[in-house]
């Protein structure tokens, strides 16, 4: 029995390690996706099905439902249900388990996938809650089915919780570790908080786009977007609230900026958008759409409060006939941001100075 318990725990931990190792391998052969997680966890479930835990030489305790908890938490109902059906069919037709148990696996898959993504607790607690739900389902089964009894369920409860907690701790710990590795690898290009390009990448990109615009005789525009009163958010509510605002602001910008243009967080509360081959009118209209969108939006803080914000936007613009100077377009946009701030904030300004 001890060997079986060790095997079950080892299979789950090894599966979780393999999940992270392939995802973060140097060659990046495997790309993270819900389908990839489903395949891996289905294989883990089948390995658990092949080696159930014997109890008193009378019972065989199956822990094949535990990988379904991870799928219910980290994927969706479609993926979880596919995995549950595959595991149930193998349990019934390959390993001779009862048809009723196969149905229960599918029911567990459906329920945990309905509940898992919406649990507000951290991942470890959420997985323990999903395990408790699964045990309750099996307990109900033992009451109404002669194939299972309370003794088997009583043994299943501590074993399943040990497996779930050990697997969850391993999963979260490795996730945090490899997330730090990814952050270190990407810190030269990306802002870790918003996922947007950082100021270093902004400089490289602006220089590159400026050269293309010069070579192709195209216009070049730059929007510098500054959140009004952002310091007050940090001072009044906390830096955690400020981070939440920055994340929401980055998502809002993604919704308004056309896909062909890149968005950057230059640092602090300043964002930028590099635009090529747009007219001045188009560039200013885009800036005004962003300003209006922010003004109409509500920003949700971690303490459940909702606040309103505004942005000041400076537009730097070089026409087709202008020499595409990276420094000039940045200076023009930066000067216009300061003018917008001095003119009362929540405005779009560009040169020649026109207020919208």
Swiss-Prot record:
Compartments (UniProt record): Cell membrane
Any GO MF annotation of the entry: diguanylate cyclase activity
Q: Which domain of life is it from?
A: Bacteria
**Domain named GGDEF: which ranges?**
218-353
Asked whether the keyword Membrane is assigned, the reply is yes
Which Cys-Cys disulphide bridges does the record give?
none
- Alphabetical list of Pfam families matching this protein: 5TM-5TMR_LYT (PF07694), GGDEF (PF00990)
Listed GO biological process terms: cell adhesion involved in single-species biofilm formation; cell wall organization; negative regulation of bacterial-type flagellum-dependent cell motility
Q: Where are the transmembrane segments?
A: 2-22, 35-55, 76-96, 99-119, 124-144, 152-172
Keywords recorded for this protein, A-Z: Cell membrane, Membrane, Transmembrane, Transmembrane helix
One GO cellular component assignment for this chain's record is: plasma membrane
Membrane topology category: Multi-pass membrane protein
Its primary localisation, in coarse terms, equals: membrane
* Stretch forming the signal peptide: none
Task: Show the InterPro entries listed in the entry.
Answer: Diguanylate_Cyclase, GGDEF_dom, Nucleotide_cyclase, Rev_trsase/Diguanyl_cyclase, Sig_transdc_His_kinase_LytS_TM
Known PROSITE patterns for this protein? Answer: GGDEF (PS50887)
Database matches in PANTHER family:
DIGUANYLATE CYCLASE DGCM-RELATED, REGULATORY COMPONENTS OF SENSORY TRANSDUCTION SYSTEM
Protein's name in the database: Uncharacterized membrane protein SH2145
Identify the species of origin: Staphylococcus haemolyticus (strain JCSC1435)
Taxonomically, what lineage is the organism?
Bacteria, Bacillati, Bacillota, Bacilli, Bacillales
């Amino acid at each position: 029995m001890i060997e079986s318990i060790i095997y079950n725990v080892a299979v789950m931990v090894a599966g979780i390690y393999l999940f992270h190792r392939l995802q973060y391998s140097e060659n990046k052969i495997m790309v993270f996706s819900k389908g990839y997680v489903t395949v891996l966890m289905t294989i883990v479930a089948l390995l658990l099905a092949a080696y159930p835990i014997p109890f008193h030489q009378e019972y065989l305790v199956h822990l094949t439902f535990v990988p379904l908890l991870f799928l219910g938490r980290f994927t969706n109902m479609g993926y979880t249900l596919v995995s549950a059906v595959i595991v149930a069919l193998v349990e019934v037709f390959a390993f001779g388990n009862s048809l009723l148990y196969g149905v229960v696996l599918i029911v567990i898959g459906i329920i945990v996938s309905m509940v898992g993504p919406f649990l507000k607790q951290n991942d470890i607690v959420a997985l323990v809650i999903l395990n408790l739900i699964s045990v309750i389902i099996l307990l109900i089964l033992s009451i109404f089915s002669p194939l299972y009894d309370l003794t088997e369920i009583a043994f299943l409860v501590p074993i399943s919780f040990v497996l779930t907690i050990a697997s969850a701790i391993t999963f979260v710990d490795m996730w945090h570790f490899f997330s730090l590795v990814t952050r270190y690898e990407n810190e030269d290009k990306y802002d870790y908080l918003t996922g947007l390009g950082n100021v270093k990448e902004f400089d490289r990109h602006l220089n590159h786009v400026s050269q293309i615009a010069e070579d192709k005789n195209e216009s070049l525009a730059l929007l510098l977007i500054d959140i009004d009163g952002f310091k007050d958010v940090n001072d009044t509510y906390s830096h955690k609230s400020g981070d939440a605002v920055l994340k929401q602001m980055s998502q809002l910008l993604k919704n308004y900026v056309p896909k062909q243009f890149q968005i950057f967080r230059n640092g602090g509360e300043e964002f930028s958008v590099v635009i090529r081959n747009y007219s001045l009118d188009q560039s200013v209209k885009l800036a005004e759409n962003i300003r209006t969108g922010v003004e109409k939006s509500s920003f949700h803080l971690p303490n459940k409060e909702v606040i309103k914000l505004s942005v000041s936007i400076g537009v730097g613009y070089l026409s087709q006939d202008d020499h595409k100077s990276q420094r000039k377009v940045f200076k023009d946009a930066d000067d216009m941001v300061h003018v917008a701030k001095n003119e009362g904030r929540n405005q779009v300004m560009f040169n020649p100075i026109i207020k919208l």
